[in-house]
């Protein structure tokens, strides 16, 4: 029987200390809901989890970018539909005045409407905007360098595409003459020429709208793909980083029992020197 070193108490204290640390770690996992709260918990798991988290955040933003692109195209296509309707009306008036039964006075009255419609084409081109960007004044035509028209549709560098919108002013659509005056229908011959000009303008608009429709569908498929990738990537990160709550509760219960028993055993070990004291009292 010795008194200078209480090895039982030392061993009990060591076990108690480690079990208390384990309880703290388990409680941290339960309170945060995450198995990995620091690199010390799982260094390799944390590294993989952080890479996955980077991709998850990037995919989520890329999906939003794609939806913004879809909104942009919808807005532009809506304005372009108005322009198309206006030119359809100009074409009808041109066909009407190509008929020789109308007097010069009649043609002048029709010309007033044609001129107003041409002005409306320019009004739409000047006022059609998305986030203060002019849509139809050539800012997004091929050859321009507007960085804002790059749609970034992926979580990584260079995963982007550019969309082009042609100039849709009356000048670009050839609805005005070289001197800036609107196209004229002052004679059956001029009215007949306007039919051809209207057809050419409508062809340009229809091609642009077809491009918009195709690109919109592409963005829609891209958004669906990004949503699927986002969900799968997030599930992968969750499996690595998140805590299994049922497993952690079982672990906490076990470790708490060990702490309680360790505390009791430490108390018992600290009682050993008292036995020596009682022995000495009997001398």
Curated annotation (Swiss-Prot):
GO cellular component, one term: periplasmic flagellum
GO MF annotation, one: structural molecule activity
Classification via SUPFAM superfamilies: Phase 1 flagellin
Gene3D superfamilies: f41 fragment of flagellin, N-terminal domain, Flagellar export chaperone, C-terminal domain
Compartmental location: Periplasmic flagellum; Periplasm
Key word Thylakoid present: no
Family label: Belongs to the bacterial flagellin family.
Assembly and interaction partners: The flagellum consists of two outer layers around a core that contains several antigenically related polypeptides.
Function: Component of the core of the flagella.
Designated name of the protein: Flagellar filament 35 kDa core protein
